[in-house]
Curated annotation (Swiss-Prot):
Skewed-composition ranges (Polar residues): 21-67
Location of the motif Arginine finger: 601-604
Family per record: Belongs to the MCM family.
Residues annotated as binding ATP 2: 430, 475-476, 577
Catalyses which reaction(s): ATP + H2O = ADP + phosphate + H(+)
Coiled coil regions, renumbered to chain: none
UniProt cross-references to InterPro entries, sorted A to Z: AAA+_ATPase, MCM, MCM_4, MCM_CS, MCM_dom, MCM_lid, MCM_N, MCM_OB
Organism: Caenorhabditis elegans
Domain of life: Eukaryota
Protein name: DNA replication licensing factor mcm-4
Residue intervals of the MCM domain: 405-729
Binding site for ATP 1: 456, 602, 692, 695
Documented EC number(s): 3.6.4.12
Amino acid sequence: MPRSNDPAEPQSESADLFAEPSSQHSSMRSGSEQVAGNMSPRSTSSASALQYGSEMGSVSQMSSASTLRRGGPRGDLGIAAVDHRTVQIRGMEDEMAGDDGQPRLYVWGTRICVADVQRSFRDFLTTFKISQLAEDENMMTGHDEALHEIDVNHPYYMERLLECNDAEVTHINLNLKHLNAFSEALYRKVIAYPADVIPYLDIVVNEVFAERFNRTLAQSIELRPFNAQKTRNMRGLNPNDVDQLITISGMVTRTSSLIPEMRSGYFQCAVCAFGIESEVDKGRIEEPVVCTNCSNTHCFQLVHNRSVFLDKQVVKLQESPDDMPSGETPHTVSVYAHGSLVESVQPGDRITVTGIFRATGMKVNPKQRALASVYRTSIDALHFRKMDTSRLHQDNGETITEERIQQIIELSKRPDIMDALAQSIAPSIYEHDDVKRGLLCLLFGGTRKDDETTNKTKLRSEINILLCGDPGTSKSQMLQYVYRLLPRSQYTSGKGSSAVGLTASVSRDADTKQLVLQTGALVLADNGVCCIDEFDKMNESARSVLHEVMEQQTLSIAKAGIICQLNARASVLAAANPVDSKWNRNKTIVENITLPHTLLSRFDLIFLIVDAQDEMQDRRLGNHLVSLYFENDGNQEKTEHVDMNLLRDYIAYAKANIHPKLSEEASQFIIEKYLFMRKAGAQHGQITAYPRQLESLIRLSEAHAKIRLSQEVSVDDVEKAFTLWREALKQSAVDPSTGRVDVAILASGMSASGRKAVEAMCEAVLKQLKTAKGFVTSKALFHTLKSADKTCQREVFDEAINELSKKESIARSGDRIRFQTEA
């Protein structure tokens, strides 16, 4: 815009965005000077819309002669009143005026005529029709508070006004793509000057509502624009976007408590009790200096209970992993939610925010008015569009169409649906069919049983899986695939994870100076999957927090006076390597990966992935790996996989709509299988099943029913789940000395045969110590037992000594041992 000291400066680019007739600056300037008292809105650099919020920008230029209806202030727009920053130009000086010669209202510093904007938007509301609607836009709430489909033969936004009348809804979501299709000029005005234009659009909406229904709601209807074409990622935000309408996507990492923000202050004179209301603009409130009633100065006091406050919440939005360059730290931005938008998002939600990008000056010294050259940026939210928790890694938030649902139902009727979907899990990884079936069950999950009305114990539906084995067997690749597939998933490495990073940390908020709880990976992965790589390298303090999460699905916090219990209903998918970088088949799983047995027993499936030496297997694997880098002429057969997008929609639809329950036949069959496993181990003095294994079998059976899109678990589902569960046990819970399955390895860390060997060693040690006089060194005692029995092992001997020491059957003094006589 030309300034008074530089008349030759060209007009700003923002003024050319709108399809309006051109006008001479001198005419507008003379008209505005005539009304505003010789102060031209263009005579200062602060009149630009991009610098809105400065001291000059907070001066209202609305003439008292305006006959336009006023609307209520909106906290999310950061303005004091609807007539903020407007100027009235009389007909003689207004080249864009009509034949009536009446004065018209313009947004200060622009060529945006308020009457033209309102007329165009009224036409849009009353005439705009669209046949293709997204699924989250084609439903409306009726008198009975039930959802009804919108009639596309009527104007779309008039149907939305009908919803406001029937269901007492006080907001309308404005799809800016609809506005752009109707009038590109009006769309650009909303994008460039949202704080100035949207309040007048609110007036039009309320006027049209009153004309059609002959009533007014208790609260004014507000517009919530979304789906702007000017969508930016956080790294793309720049000074050109300040005070403009933007749309960005990200993940919510933290939400503050509700903050009461003053919108209107009531000041009362301490001498004569005369009251004056003062509007708050951009967080600033001007205290009256002189009382107009008694003429005293500096005598006003703020009365809080007569002031107007508005709910406010600070939402920390973090850059989405899809938009983040590799090796970079994620960017964050503060989003301010006002009014009905507060408490609408939770940490871990992936959302799309439409709002006004703000830049606020920071003081060099809190006691001085001087501002630093660096400004703090934030976003005043106008609309939150939350991605459904059952949706998978899509940023547009669109739901599944009817055509896609029919395609999903047709796919579920295939007899080999389990194998077809399993082969589509990480198709570039060769074989590992059982592991892929287990991952498929993890993606679908079981049926949640948390009905509080029945006073029953809550049982988890999430399935936990551990992948262990030799390095280079695609364990991390499978974790990465699952992480990219699910919406509320978190990926972390055991070496770089701490207990605070997994659970929650307490920090002091920079704005409110209060202690706040910052949630970690397990809480952010609520209703999703937490992928933990290098599980064996995680320190003990970080690993100990998983015990409660993997069974109770909650996380108890007691830090710095903050005591709470957070939901962590997340499936845990972990990968671990053996101790010596090579799996030793002569050792149990507890000895190979040095994980506590209390944690191992909480995994539903433990898969052992070993790099076996087999020439034919190596040749097939080599051909598969080479085919990933070299494309042949199509001579080799290609396996048809389910399309990735179809697989995502299939899982989302099943998790949202299918909740299978056990049938009578399936219940009896599960009990028979459980008793069969118990009896099979009892013959050899081993335990092959615990109640936790029974619950795992039920969850796996429910997951198989979900894969078929069945609301009932059949006997065939139980049979397939039992086969998968048995194959996993054969790999992970086999006693190396006997070759039989022994679940006691997972439950107690030692097999039944190992327990018997330790008990026999305890008897031999006590027999030797009873005949010895005084203390005997453990080395000499072991050599004595070794000479009598060549099969004696040092590990069994040490375990026996520890057991006897716990029972206080022996007395130890360093390396010396003696028999403990009874008192």
